[in-house]
Amino acid sequence: ITNKVSWVGKIDWELTKFHGDELSTKHGSSYNAYLIEDEKTALIDTVWQPYDKEFVARLKKTIDLKKIDYIVMNHNEIDHSGALVELMREIPDTPIYCTKKGESIIRGHYHPEGWNFVNVKTGDTLNLGENTLTFIEAPMLHWPDTMFSYLSGENILFSNDAFGQHFATESLYNDTVKQDDLMWE
């Protein structure tokens, strides 16, 4: 995405249904996770649990996991947080930045022992070096714990599901895919 920000998510070409029969996905989906490498390194979100081992293995090829200073969980529905347990087995002392409600949801899903949660609220910041993450709570925009993270310097808003849709493509940008397919979804 930039010299400091990489997409490290998963494209799921096989997914046809999400949330049961409520939501069909003609073109699969993607699970978006991002790695910010500055003076400090932050991982934003993970991927769905069926891909947890693959996610961690691919992440290891990208970076020594011990160099990840922070995990930021913008949203904790299982397609965003599903690989967190597998990742925390590797780097159990890494602090997890999320809203108070986000921590509650993670605890409800995974029953973690000894994880280091740092609860953030709107306006809180995390300095990474040249860039700073600013957190913006957006509860119930999509889910009770929804939070955005804005990366100053790079001018990137990590908005999780707020502007997204289920659509599998190798392109990271919506203006580089067939617009008819995009609108159908």
Q: Which residues does each PLM region occupy?
A:
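Metallo-beta-lactamase
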Residues: I1-N3, T41, C98-E185
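Conserved beta-strand hairpin/beta-sheet module of binuclear metal-dependent hydrolase folds
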Residues: N3-K61, F148-L151, N155-S159
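Active-site environment of divalent metal-dependent phosphoester hydrolases
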Residues: L15, Y51, N76-S81, E103-I106, ...
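Active-site metal-binding motif and surrounding structural segment of the metallo-beta-lactamase
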Residues: E39, P50-Y97
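Short catalytic-loop micro-motif centered on adjacent basic/acidic residues
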Residues: A42-D45, Y70-M73, T134-F135
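Short, conserved acidic/polar surface loops in the N-terminal third of protein domains
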Residues: F55-V56, S81-E86, R107-Y110, T146-M147, ...
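Short, structured coil segments at secondary-structure junctions
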Residues: E90-P92, Y110-E113, S152
